[in-house]
Every structure is written in structure tokens, then in C-alpha cells.
Amino acid sequence: MSHRDTGTHYENQARHYLERAGLVFKAANVTYQNGEIDLIMRDGDTWVFVEVRFRRNALFGGAAASVTYSKQQRLLRAATIWLAQRNACFATTPCRFDVFAITGSELEWLPNAFNAD
């Protein structure tokens, strides 16, 4: 399986898990020059921007640990653009940033993993 196919597989797995948890799927793989948003979901009135990470094992800290500060900043920039295209911003629109981490066969959903602050 190619790297891209692997990413799509785990993004679909995350999407279905989150849908079963009650979130509503809105978009996937939204890409801008500054970054990419793996999944955009809706949880009631809140927009949820989801970073999906997969690691085969926890040797270097696992999937959740791979969401570095610079990765968070790229996701924040992409979400800022996405919101602006809809005449919205973090100050006026309920949003959160979740991480869906898959390490080996272990799934970990981290709601509100980091902030736009």
C-alpha cells in the first residue's frame, strides 16, 4: 500500500469512528499552500478540524506525539483560511482542533488537543 493509500485508509477509519461518535462529516483533505486539514467535522455548532496520524509503533512516542508545534501551526493556518473563505473566524465561530492518533492497532481520539490561541 502506498503512503497516500495508507493515509486515506486511516483517515477513513477516523472519519467512521467520529461519525459513530455523533460528529457529522463535512470535508476531507482540504489543502492550502500553508497546510492541510485531514478532516473537517461538525459537532453540534462547533467546527472540528481533525489531524489524523498513524504510526506503526510507539518507538518514537507514537502517533499523538508526532503532532508537533509546527504541525499545529500549519493546521491553524489552514483552518484560518478555510474559515475566512466562509466569512468566519476563530473569534466568532466555535471551533476545536482534535487529533485522531492510531499507533499500531490502538485508536486514540483527543478532542480539543490544542487551541487557536
UniProtKB/Swiss-Prot annotation:
Which CDD domains does the entry link to? PoNe_Nuclease (cd20736)
Q: Which Pfam families match?
A: UPF0102
**Taxonomic superkingdom:** Bacteria
**What GO molecular function annotation could you give as one example from this UniProt entry?**
nucleic acid binding
Q: What HAMAP family is this protein classified in?
A: UPF0102 (MF_00048)
Q: Which NCBIfam families match?
A: PRK12497.1-3 (NF009150), YraN family protein (TIGR00252)
Q: Which family does it belong to?
A: Belongs to the UPF0102 family.
* Name the UniProt record assigns to this protein: UPF0102 protein YE3728
Organism the protein comes from: Yersinia enterocolitica serotype O:8 / biotype 1B (strain NCTC 13174 / 8081)
